[in-house]
Amino acid sequence: LAAQSSWRDISEVSFTDGDRYLLANLIYCEAGGEPYEGQVAVGAVVINRVLSSVFPNTLSGVIYQSGQFEPVSTGRLALALAEDRATDSCYRAADEAMSGVTNVGNCVFFRTPIPGLEGINIGGHVFY
């Protein structure tokens, strides 16, 4: 999928404080209990999607795209946002990802590992 898309450069995207809040809280929901590297990786996947022509071109568009992130569909993200559950490390990871840092290359997906799925394993997720 990544090979079929065209990519914008991170310098072509500007993020708001609201984007930072949203991304940090998504990172909290998806990887709050993971090592810091796993938090950065989740943020990097979201930013990679923003930069890819295959996905929506805004951070909120990517996060709220139907069926993509489980905490959106379960209501967990809404609760985290209402209470600003994101930790300092989640905010640091969001800042790194929004500045273009990636420890997962151009990966645009992650999940819990399943047999036969090749990718980059960080914490309890595989990134691909």
Predicted regions and their residues:
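Bacterial extracytoplasmic/cell-wall-associated proteins, especially those involved in peptidoglycan
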Residues: 3-128
